[in-house]
Amino acid sequence: MQPYTSRKIWLIIAGLICLSSVSCFANPLYVNVPSTPYDRQMTRIRPVLFSGSAASKQDVSMALVNHWMGDLRSIPYGFSMEWKTPAEVQTGAAADCKGKAVALYEMMHSRGAEDLRLVIGKRTVTSRKTHAWLEWTISGGTYVLDPTINWTACRADRLGNSSYIPLYAYAGARKYRAATATLYAKSHLQAGQKVASNL
């Protein structure tokens, strides 16, 4: 008696090939969630995230985004326990990653930027504290916008797996938990094995 039929083996092999190709990408996958551990802290900036765009269409160029990033990067770093509003960032003497990311989010969103996410995660795999930045997906790819560290936008696919590791993201009223493609593939592999065992 054979423990596995050839059909089951081929299904498992095909599933592994498909899932391994998904796990080759460094970009995270975002899973919609009803809440995040940061929701209470985000109260002050919720109006920025939830505001509608004044622009009828996307009117944001990479040159303009890089200009805004440079302006925000030139603001001295100063940690704040609470999330500063964009107005507080623009008028204050210093701002941290949270304030700078939210200020850039507001500038871009007001000009109609789409596929824009405020991300909370780790700057590097060895980071002990969390960091905030934006991710912006356009036809040319996904860009990491970090006005605390960088003067210009960076293509996400050129950063590798050891930097800008997302944990949670906000896009308007939507909230997400990040799942790496490897974890996504692993969970779907387990689900695929359950299906294959039922054949």
Regions found by a protein language model. Name each.
Residues 12-21:
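Bacterial N-terminal signal peptides
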Residues 2-12:
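Bacterial N-terminal signal peptides that target proteins for export
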Residues 4, 23-199:
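A structural boundary/capping signal
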